[in-house]
Amino acid sequence: MKYMIHGEIDPETGVEVEAQPDKIQELIGKWQALNPIGMYFSLTRRTMTIIVDAPNEDAFFEPLHAMWVLTKDYPDVYPVASVDEFPQILQRAGIIG
């Protein structure tokens, strides 16, 4: 299953985070250890979006927790599917035959 994880840092916390570049690199390293499909950083806001392919949420608990601690906010976690995978999911759910 693919998951999209999105975190945002408010301006006040952002100043604290930017003063700890080693913590930012540590967080990025934890996500990179999962070989993400993609990692994106907003150029206009303090946001980070990561897309991982994992069997379940347990696989990325450590970087998720590190993100929560660093940003002082709960990241959003969305299970997602590609347009090619979506019909199979609908079929498993009994929505289409």
Feature names for model-found ranges:
Residues M1-T47, P55-D58, V80, D84-G97:
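Short S/T/G/P-rich N-terminal loop/turn motif that feeds into the first structured element of a domain
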Residues L70-S82:
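Conserved short beta-strand edge segments in small beta-sheet-based binding/regulatory domains
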Residues I50-W68, K72:
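Mid-chain, well-packed structural core segment of small domains
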